[in-house]
Structures are given as C-alpha cells and as structure tokens.
UniProtKB/Swiss-Prot annotation:
This is Small ribosomal subunit protein uS14. One of its GO terms (biological process) is translation. Its cofactor is Zn(2+). Keywords: Metal-binding, Ribonucleoprotein, Ribosomal protein, RNA-binding, rRNA-binding, Zinc. Belongs to the universal ribosomal protein uS14 family. Zinc-binding uS14 subfamily.
Amino acid sequence: MARKSLIAKAKKRPKFKTRAYNRCKICGRSHAYLRKFGMCRICFRELAHEGKLPGVRKASW
C-alpha cells in the first residue's frame, strides 16, 4: 500500500500540469495504472476475477 502522505500529495493540484500523476483509486499504487478503469493492474485483476467489473472477461483463444 502507498503511504497516506503520497496519496494525499497526489490528490492536490500541482503548480505545473506535468507534475500530475495518476494513482489507483483503491490502493494508491502509482505504477501499472490503467486509465480506462482508474486503478492499478493488481486491483483490476482482483475485481475482474470476482466479476465486479462489468464487461470484463478473461481472454481465451
């Protein structure tokens, strides 16, 4: 889990737009962020396996 101070820091609007970065809405992780879902790959995978993300299916080919 991300430190609470880093999560709070990311929520604040930065002085310059390029300093802004995305964090997972669930756990606060900054890496492996999926913009379409607003969460990191780990949270995405857990919720997808539980069936809590509508329209997401496991690939099979």
